[in-house]
Amino acid sequence: SSLDELSGLPNIVYLDRGESYEDDRLRVNAFGSTDMGVSYLVTAEGKTIFHAGDLNNWHWRDESTEEEVREAETAYLSELYYMKRTIKSIDVAMFPVDARLGKDYMRGAEQFVGEFNVGMFVPMHFYPVVRKAESFAPIAKRYGTEFVLLSSTGDSVII
């Protein structure tokens, strides 16, 4: 597998949920995901940056049973609860706002900004439906969170 190929390379660190890495420049805490992989909190130069990966309230209410929706929500909220033991505030959060979920596509993102003090929210997993991601801006504002949309290759933001 590609992971096996990378394992022999220098300067590569693998983290599972609950593990961390720290050197003289940064600290990385790995949290869980409700799909593949893990999510990360990176702390460097006094700033905290959260990359959700595939952590989200992944349910398709339009297609799922009530039990499946409940299970997805419980798994997601359990991970947020676990994260709150470590995370107090987040300067920048990159988080899925995925319209494929149907009518509740912003639910996980809203739950996230509702649980954590997030300075800046950067949506991801939205391409090519940019306008759906933009719909989260007023929700972020309601929680006192700046909304920044990076929708083109090379877009950047200074934090």
Residue ranges and their predicted role:
Residues S1-E5, Y82-M94:
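Active-site metal-binding motif and surrounding structural segment of the metallo-beta-lactamase
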Residues T65-A75, T86, V92-G114:
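Active-site-proximal segments of metal-dependent phosphoesterases and phosphodiesterases across multiple
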Residues S1, F50-G53, R70-E71, V92-D98, ...:
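Active-site neighborhood of phospho(di)ester-bond hydrolases with catalytic His/Asp-centered motifs
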Residues P10-E19, L101, Y105-I159:
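Binuclear metal-ion centers of metallo-dependent hydrolases, dominated by the metallo-beta-lactamase
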Residues D4-L6, A72-L77, Y143-E146:
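Short acidic/polar alpha-helix capping motifs at helix-coil junctions
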Residues N11-S89, S152-I159:
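Core dinuclear metal-dependent hydrolase active-site scaffold
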